[in-house]
């Protein structure tokens, strides 16, 4: 290094060159600082946007899972338990008042001690029929607006709808065989029944109420089911022999209207407590989504302020 030759101009020229180089070095440092700041800002913005998106997705998935699990488990369980308990109580009340109002002694207490009763076998007051074979293939190939009822107990026994009907008007139907043999329903519409259903049509509607017949039969039908056979069964022959007592038509209708309204409240899928349970579940879903979105927005606002 000591042997390297260096040429020097006069001192005044050396000083001018050194001043120029110092100025250039200073400008270079300033430019480097500005470029560094600008690049840092751009990079920060890009990273912030990318990080925000990634973090938002992670938070969304995490919060959604946690919030959904916690709210659904806690609120849904509490709501379901509360309303289900209420429904059970209403059904107990219904069973109590049904049994009470269909008792001859109680009817006389309410409507008068001299209320007369007449006793008849089902065969004496009803035309008795049975449904026809309607399988799933027939339901698929003949879609329509008219209900088809079978031995099912959910949804009133409805199994589908077709484009024609076998019966029109007031009927009482019962399940002839299977686990639900002896279940009784009131119908008043255009409909059809499968082979697992029997039908009763009141002959004299000026003397007998189909609704009252339905409620009175519900108290007795299960007693006449043959549970000794391989499949429980309540045959047409057997149901025809059931004896029921009837007060005057006016009293029948009053009792039937009370029981029908109470039963509708307890069991109808579009009214009463079951509908309330469904409505509350929809409200739960709404507020759950609302709270989740609110929390998520708050988290994103915090990220943007970083």
From Swiss-Prot:
Belongs to the type-I restriction system S methylase family. InterPro entries: Restrct_endonuc_typeI_TRD, Restrct_endonuc_typeI_TRD_sf, Type-I_RE_S_subunit. Keywords: DNA-binding, Restriction system. GO terms for molecular function: DNA binding. The specificity (S) subunit of a type I methyltransferase (MTase); this subunit dictates DNA sequence specificity. The single R subunit has multiple frameshifts and is probably not expressed. Gene3D superfamilies: DNA methylase specificity domains (3.90.220.20). Pfam families: Methylase_S. The methyltransferase is composed of M and S polypeptides. It comes from Mycoplasma pneumoniae (strain ATCC 29342 / M129 / Subtype 1) (Mycoplasmoides pneumoniae). Contains two DNA recognition domains, each specifying recognition of one of the two defined components of the target sequence. GO terms for biological process: DNA restriction-modification system. This is Putative type I specificity subunit S.MpnORF285P.
């Amino acid at each position: 290094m000591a042997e390297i030759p260096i040429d020097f101009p006069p001192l005044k020229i050396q000083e001018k060159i050194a001043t120029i180089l110092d100025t250039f070095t200073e400008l270079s440092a300033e430019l480097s600082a500005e470029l560094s700041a600008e690049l840092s800002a751009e990079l920060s913005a890009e990273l912030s946007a990318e990080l925000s998106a990634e973090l938002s997705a992670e938070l969304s998935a995490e919060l959604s899972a946690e919030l959904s699990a916690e709210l659904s488990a806690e609120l849904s369980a509490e709501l379901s338990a509360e309303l289900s308990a209420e429904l059970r109580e209403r059904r107990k009340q219904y069973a109590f008042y049904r049994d009470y109002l269909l008792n001859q002694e109680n009817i006389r207490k309410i409507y008068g001690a001299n209320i007369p009763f007449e006793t008849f076998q089902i065969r004496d007051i009803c035309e008795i029929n049975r449904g026809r074979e309607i399988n799933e293939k027939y339901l698929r190939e003949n879609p329509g607006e008219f209900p088809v009822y079978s031995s099912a107990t959910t949804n009133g026994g409805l199994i589908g709808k077709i484009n024609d009907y076998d019966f029109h008007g007031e009927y009482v139907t019962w399940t002839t065989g299977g686990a639900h043999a002896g279940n009784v329903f009131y119908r008043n519409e255009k409909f059809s029944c499968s082979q697992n259903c029997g039908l009763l049509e009141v002959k004299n509607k000026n003397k007998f109420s189909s609704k009252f017949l339905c409620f009175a039969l519900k108290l007795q039908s299960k007693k006449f089911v043959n549970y000794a056979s391989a499949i429980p069964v309540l045959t047409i022959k057997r149901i025809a022999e059931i004896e029921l007592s009837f007060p005057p038509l006016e009293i029948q209708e009053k009792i039937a209207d009370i029981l029908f309204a109470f039963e509708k409240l307890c069991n109808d899928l579009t009214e009463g407590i079951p509908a309330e349970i469904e409505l509350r579940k929809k409200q739960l879903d709404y507020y759950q989504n609302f709270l989740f979105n609110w929390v998520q927005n708050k988290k994103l606002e915090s990220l943007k302020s970083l």
